[in-house]
């Protein structure tokens, strides 16, 4: 029960339509991995400052930048449609804005999969106090 409560607290602080993005990540990576990317490095989780610490953290930086370019809908709350095809995701639906959110999430999930070998536990729960450098532009 305590683990469930901790996960609920962590889920509240993550940007995006968390449930969809989390399910997409788990599907693309082939296992339950969402918890590993909460508060990883300087960009995975809520917000982001400093320099990405590795390729995994850069996936989150690019995801944050992608969300920043979305206009006309809210990437933090709006739902979108997608289908699963052979370990990959195909974004669908008629709403171009929601499709853009889906593409941001799809690219990030694929980036995590492609860079899973760079994941380093020393960056999990890393903390913003370790990310004080100037942020690079998107």
From Swiss-Prot:
Statement: the UniProt record of this protein carries the keyword Mitochondrion: no
Keywords, sorted A to Z: Calcium, Disulfide bond, Hydrolase, Lipid degradation, Lipid metabolism, Metal-binding, Myotoxin, Secreted, Signal, Toxin
Hydrolase is among the record's keywords: yes
Catalytic activity as recorded in UniProt: a 1,2-diacyl-sn-glycero-3-phosphocholine + H2O = a 1-acyl-sn-glycero-3-phosphocholine + a fatty acid + H(+)
Pfam families: Phospholip_A2_1
Stretch forming the signal peptide: 1-16
PROSITE patterns from the UniProt entry: PA2_ASP (PS00119), PA2_HIS (PS00118)
GO cellular component: extracellular region
EC number(s) stated in the UniProt entry for this protein: 3.1.1.4
GO terms, molecular function: calcium ion binding; calcium-dependent phospholipase A2 activity; phospholipid binding; toxin activity
Classification via CDD domains: PLA2c
Compartments it resides in: Secreted
Main location group: secreted
InterPro entries: PLipase_A2, PLipase_A2_Asp_AS, PLipase_A2_dom, PLipase_A2_dom_sf, PLipase_A2_His_AS
Role description: Snake venom phospholipase A2 (PLA2) that induces edema in mice, produces neuromuscular blockade in chick biventer cervicis, increases CK release and produces myonecrosis. PLA2 catalyzes the calcium-dependent hydrolysis of the 2-acyl groups in 3-sn-phosphoglycerides.
Family indicated by similarity: Belongs to the phospholipase A2 family. Group II subfamily. D49 sub-subfamily.
PANTHER family listed in its UniProt record: PHOSPHOLIPASE A2 FAMILY MEMBER, PHOSPHOLIPASE A2, MEMBRANE ASSOCIATED
Name of this protein: Acidic phospholipase A2 BITP01A
Organism: Bothrops insularis
């Amino acid at each position: 029960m305590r683990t469930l409560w901790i996960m609920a607290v962590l889920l509240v602080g993550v940007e995006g339509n968390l449930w969809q993005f989390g399910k997409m990540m788990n599907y693309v990576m082939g296992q339950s991995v969402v918890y590993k990317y909460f508060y990883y490095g300087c960009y995975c989780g809520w917000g982001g400052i400093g320099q990405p610490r590795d390729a995994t953290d850069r996936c989150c930086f690019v995801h944050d930048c992608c969300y920043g370019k979305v206009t006309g809908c809210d990437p933090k709350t709006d739902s979108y449609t997608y289908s699963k095809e052979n370990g990959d995701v195909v974004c669908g639906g008629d709403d171009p804005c929601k499709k853009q959110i889906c593409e941001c999430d799809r690219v990030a999930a694929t980036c995590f999969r492609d860079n899973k070998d760079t994941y380093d536990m020393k960056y999990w729960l890393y903390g913003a106090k370790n990310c004080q450098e100037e942020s690079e532009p998107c």
